[in-house]
Regions:
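Solvent-exposed, non-transmembrane regions of membrane-associated and secreted proteins
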Residues: 4-121, 125-210
Length: 210
């Protein structure tokens, strides 16, 4: 599934990506009713949860996350600039495959959770706290990511790069998106931050040193 982004900038600074139809939910296999095997319990606790908070220590950000969808193919962040939106039809943070997309408004006068997103640097830490879904067992999770790339794209460039930036076919990663380049009436660009699981980053560094 490819997420195509159409930048409809407004004074509030919210990116509004146009999204495809939701993907089919993945199927799971469970044991017989009333039987909870160790393997089943381990699998349940290992599944990614639903994100409810983003923490970015370098930006002093600790913001709630709400699931958002795109019934009209337009993904709009929550109206409150201190609240972020997670594209619920894409990957969950912690999933092995796919880009988990989190978006938020930028406020040119200040007050948006992602106002300073473009100042992140490679290697900065990003944490996503998740909860279990209704009827799911297992502890709450915290996914640790490391910033890999920070880019600013104009509208046309972002549209051309969307298939790669928001791909659901890549190894699991986190993508943060907000607006940038306020010209007095609207935002002209988007900031896109790509972060990879911290464990993956540690493995790659160990291989490079080896």
């Amino acid at each position: 599934v490819v997420l195509t982004v159409v930048l409809l900038t407004r004074g509030e600074g919210g990116p509004t990506p146009a999204a495809p139809a939701p993907t089919s939910p993945s199927s799971t296999t469970t044991g017989p009713p009333g039987v909870d095997t160790t393997e089943d319990a381990t699998y349940a606790s290992a599944r990614p949860g639903y994100p409810d908070r983003l923490v970015v220590p370098a930006l002093d950000v600790d913001a709630p996350i709400r699931p958002i969808r795109a019934p009209d193919r337009t993904l709009v962040p929550p109206a409150d600039p201190q609240v972020l939106g997670w594209w619920a039809d894409g990957a969950r943070p912690g999933a092995d495959t796919g880009s988990a997309l989190v978006v938020g408004h930028t406020v040119h006068t200040g007050g948006g959770a992602l106002d300073d997103l473009e100042t992140l640097a490679e290697g900065d830490e990003v944490l996503v706290h998740s909860h279990r879904g209704s009827g799911e067992e297992g502890p709450e999770r915290t996914e640790s990511y490391v910033v890999q790339d920070v880019e600013v794209y104009r509208k046309g460039t972002l549209a051309r790069r969307a298939a790669d930036l928001f791909s659901q076919e890549v190894d699991g990663r986190l993508v943060l998106l907000t607006c940038e380049d306020w010209d007095g009436t609207r935002y002209l660009s988007n900031v896109v931050v790509t972060a990879v699981p911290a464990a993956d980053e540690d493995d790659s560094e160990g291989t490079a040193r080896g």
